[in-house]
Curated annotation (Swiss-Prot):
Belongs to the UPF0122 family. It comes from the Bacteria. Disulfide bonds: none annotated. This is UPF0122 protein SPD_1143. InterPro entries: RNA_pol_sigma_r3/r4-like, UPF0122, UPF0122_fam_protein, WH-like_DNA-bd_sf. It comes from Streptococcus pneumoniae serotype 2 (strain D39 / NCTC 7466). Pfam families: UPF0122 (PF04297). Might take part in the signal recognition particle (SRP) pathway. This is inferred from the conservation of its genetic proximity to ftsY/ffh. May be a regulatory protein.
């Protein structure tokens, strides 16, 4: 499994997990976050390896579709880059730093 895809799926899962079914959440979390194999997940849930594979592939597509429509992850990345640039350019502006900390905490709350 390639690391870029794993990182992206984990990030998309963080943003859109609440929109998934319990089964989708469990399979994706076990596969990407906990690094379970398809066989291990299948054994855990008493289903075939193919059923797990199909569910994970469908859920990956669902997560990508949510991102295409809602842009929550890509917007988060852009905001983070802008905040970093502002902090780098104005390192002594305490007010600006405080405001960025507030905005960052809003982005990072669960």
């Amino acid at each position: 499994m390639e690391i870029e895809k794993t990182n992206r799926m984990n990030a998309l899962f963080e943003f859109y997990a609440a929109l998934l079914t319990d089964k989708q959440m469990n399979y994706i979390e076990l596969y990407y976050a906990d690094d379970y194999s398809l066989a291990e997940i299948a054994e855990e849930f008493g289903v075939s390896r193919q059923a797990v594979y199909d569910n994970i592939k469908r859920t990956e597509k669902i997560l990508e579709d949510y991102e295409m429509k809602l842009h929550m992850y890509s917007d988060y990345i852009v905001r983070s880059q802008i905040f970093d640039q502002i902090l780098e350019r104005y390192p002594k502006d305490n007010f600006l730093q405080e405001q960025i900390e507030i905005l960052t905490s809003i982005d990072n709350r669960e």
